[in-house]
Curated annotation (Swiss-Prot):
Catalytic reaction(s) noted: a ubiquinone + NADH + 5 H(+)(in) = a ubiquinol + NAD(+) + 4 H(+)(out)
EC number(s) from the headed UniProt entry: 7.1.1.2
Family statement drawn from the similarity comment of this UniProt entry: Belongs to the complex I subunit 4L family.
Alphabetical list of InterPro entries matching this protein: NADH_UbQ_OxRdtase_chain4L/K (IPR001133), NUOK/Mnh_C1-like (IPR039428)
Organism lineage: Eukaryota, Fungi, Fungi incertae sedis, Blastocladiomycota, Blastocladiomycetes
Cell compartment(s), UniProt: Mitochondrion membrane
Coarse class of the protein's main subcellular location: mitochondrion
GO molecular function terms listed in the Swiss-Prot or TrEMBL record: NADH dehydrogenase (ubiquinone) activity
Entry protein name: NADH-ubiquinone oxidoreductase chain 4L
Job description of the protein: Core subunit of the mitochondrial membrane respiratory chain NADH dehydrogenase (Complex I) that is believed to belong to the minimal assembly required for catalysis. Complex I functions in the transfer of electrons from NADH to the respiratory chain. The immediate electron acceptor for the enzyme is believed to be ubiquinone.
One Gene Ontology cellular component: NADH dehydrogenase complex
Length: 99
């Protein structure tokens, strides 16, 4: 059981680092920034769920669902703003906002 939780933590950490790295590398494309933020939130939620299963804690699992609900609403608002930005500027690049 301990080996499985360590493997799950490693997977969650790798996903988190991929999300942070994507956020650092893709600073020009707004859509890729939103995807990177979502990946980091999903990685954090994955780690919390694995901890909740290991510790048999239902409150942590509920907290993880709360994080996922907030991430979904954040993505919906971000994508709607991205659609408006694309309509007005014709591009989803951050450099287009400086015109």
């Amino acid at each position: 059981m301990l080996l499985e939780i360590i493997t799950a933590y490693k997977i969650g950490t790798i996903l988190f680092l991929i999300g942070i790295l994507g956020f650092i590398i893709n600073r020009q494309n707004i859509l890729l920034l939103i995807i990177s933020i979502e990946m980091t939130l999903l990685a954090i939620s994955f780690i919390i769920i694995c901890s909740a299963l290991f510790l048999d804690d239902s409150a942590a699992a509920c907290f993880s669902l709360y994080i996922l609900a907030l991430a979904g609403s954040e993505a919906a608002i971000g994508l709607s703003l991205l659609v408006l930005f694309h309509r007005f500027r014709g591009s989803v690049l951050i450099s287009a906002s400086r015109q």
